[in-house]
Amino acid sequence: MNFKFFTNNSVNLIIAGFLLIFSYSCQNAENDSTKLKDPNFSYENYKPSGNEIIISRSEYVNKLKGFWLAQCIANWTGLVTEMDKIGNIGEIKTGEFYTRDDWGKEDQPAYWGGTKDFSRTIDFVFEGDDGNWGADDDTDIEYIYQHLLYTNKVSKLSGNQIRDGWLKHIKNEEENFLWVSNQRALDLMISGTIPPETSNPEKNPDFDMIDAQLTTEIFGFFSPARPDFAVEMAELPIQTTARFNAEWISKFYVSMYSMAANADPNLSIKDNLISFAEKSRKELPDDSYASKMYDFVKKQYYDGIPWETIRDNVYQRYQVEQKDGYDLTSRNMRCNACAAAGINFAASIVSLFAGEGDLKETIKIGSLAGWDSDNPTATWGGLIGFMIGADGVEKAFDRTFSEEYNIHRTRQNFPNGIDNFTNMANIGVFITDRVIQNELGGGVDLVKNLWYIPKSN
């Protein structure tokens, strides 16, 4: 045996094998990193300046999946108690509000006398691996806006694009799962009115209802860590149905959602949420009843008052005594304006503070707080779900869930009536790619799968 010949050939074979493996690995890595690439968008080269916020796109997919999943859990759980407890003013009286002791007990009828077929018990509502989550107005309008942004290839929708999208995807003659200001806006669109005129108080008397705050939070995720542009991006969709306090409240939520993309890893979920809320408080003018509601609930929380008592105090102060300029009771509206932006915002701040960043506890408190209880639960469930990601949501509940979403339960004319959270999250990332590159002056690194987001001035 020629030892020298054997050694040289062995080395050559080893080197050749290594190069082959290295080449294959690099090719796979490149394929993996560029898999999440929008075929309808032209990515530009970007040279980081070193003064950007850096966010992983792959982690963002998991976070957006967590948003959709937790929002669906929270939405459907909150629907169990929706409008069960709205107070005792006027002709409609619903008795004492729920407390923590009512969790796990039989659900009481809503104020109109209806019961919920999907659950007779006040408890979490889940969809197993073999099912699909039903759309509701807390998720489906956000789905429409995401679809419109992507298919129109824009970062900011025009009034005509919003109107055309609503008329295409929202039913008119049949049950359409719209209420108060959303329904008024649709009726105005049908007659030819274009947003933002659809929320003009002279045309839409429901301009101060809850609608916009449950349909526009998602815009915050499309402008990660840049609430300045997130609020700008969401302004017209918000003004499609809301003005004044209802508009400011919606911008508060959008701002918080945007900030969640750059949470401080050294802080707890609770402390991050409070930080987002405190910074987003600037969206609420100091002389607005919305800002006073926020401050009122916050003070009582830090005074150590139980959440049930804070909620009761909110009811007494704002619906009974009509303090801080909140005069909706005097307007003698149906169910004492139980779907108003203000009272439901105050209830949501109760569950935000008292839930202390715990997903399950926040959903519980939101469900038991009263009024339009599926809305605050969906808002905070979606936000916390985003912060902990889809895997974190499943860990919190110690189980797995379906990720299929039935948009055609409530809406129409989409390519896929049954969508899934992974696809929905990918579309969200593509929209965010466009915002970061075209609006924020940042960059998308498809190889490293990173966003570079310039900090605001």
Each PLM stretch: what is its role?
Residues 51-55, 186-207, 216-226, 235-240, ...:
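Accessory "access/gating" subregions that flank catalytic or transport cores
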Residues 111-136, 407-436:
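A structural-propensity feature for long, helix-poor, extended segments
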Residues 69, 131-137, 141, 146-250:
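Active-site cavity-forming subdomains of large catalytic enzyme subunits
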Residues 22-25:
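C-terminal motif of bacterial Sec signal peptides marking the signal peptidase cleavage site
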Residues 79-126, 139-141, 163, 173-176:
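Active-site-surrounding "flap" and adjacent substrate/cofactor-binding loops of secreted or lumenal enzymes
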Residues 73, 77, 84-102, 242-245, ...:
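Catalytic phosphate/nucleotide-handling subdomain of diverse soluble enzymes
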Residues 2-14:
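Bacterial N-terminal signal peptides that target proteins for export
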Residues 27-33:
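Bacterial lipoprotein signal-peptidase II cleavage site
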